[in-house]
Amino acid sequence: MNKFFVLFIAIFSFVLSLSPLSAKRIISLTPSLTKNLQYLGSENELVGCTSYCKTTRKIPVVASAVKVNVEKVVSLKPDLVIASTLTQPETIAALKKIGVKTVVFPMAHSFSEICAQFLQLGKLIGKEAQAQKVLRQINQKIAKLKATTTSNQRVFIQLGANPLFAVIPNTFMNDYIVFAGAKNITQGMTSGSITREAVLTRNPEAIFIVTMGVFAGQEKREWERYSNLAAVKNKKIFIIDSDKACTPTPVTFAETLELIMKNLK
């Protein structure tokens, strides 16, 4: 009888090890993962985050943009720490070494990868059904947006000013342009660094300036100086919110795509 009991316990423990984690104390080291937790209805389980995370309630800050306070993380006794590859490998190794369950999500290079990681997070915290529900809604929204695509315009999405940086292929932000049926003027480039002269030569018909600090308005006025630029003639130089545009979540992707497509019409 005891042998059967021991066998039952062993099997039960194995099944539990395969089941999703119902984490009750989560620490997020990346703003996009914090947003995803909110979309999954799990903000109440969040016990620590970075100084850049936006939350609806006050949550202990355990990290800046570049440094994680490992001691504070440990003191909060998390069931799970989620991070991106932007977190220092040494920090991840230190957390794992002391037994803190830590999962690192790689940088998403496409909308499909954003969705896959969202579903992975849902499974990880026992919210797979909610993740699937959100993804169904978002994919339906994007399908409707893509069905209205009429644009074939040359588009430039600007990320920085000094130096000038652009959205390039093989990034999730490039999918904004692709899904809108437009053409990225940086097609063929493998680095985001670009000169103003190169942009003028490619003559975009629409420019989207992603707000990062106070430079956006200045950059818009700078582009408007070039009266022969197609985007200036078309009056299609726009400023978009970096908090949404640069954050790889299914929800913010759909919101940004909708805005871009509206402005391209």
Model regions and ranges:
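Bacterial N-terminal signal peptides
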Residues: V6-S17
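Boundary at the C-terminal end of the N-terminal hydrophobic targeting segment
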Residues: S17-A23
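Structured C-terminal subdomain patch of bacterial secreted/periplasmic proteins
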Residues: K24, E113-K123, Q130-Q132, R136, ...
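Basic- and aromatic-lined ligand-binding clefts that recognize polyanionic substrates
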Residues: K24-Q38, A129-A180
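A short, structured surface patch at a secondary-structure boundary
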Residues: R25-L86, V103
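His/Asp/Glu-enriched short active-site or ligand-binding loop at hydrolase and phosphoryl-transfer sites
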Residues: T50, P60, N170-G192, I239
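Flexible loop/hinge segments that line or gate small-molecule binding clefts
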Residues: T55, T87, T91-Q120
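Short helices/loops that flank or line small-molecule/ion binding pockets
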Residues: V70-K77, I98, T195-A206
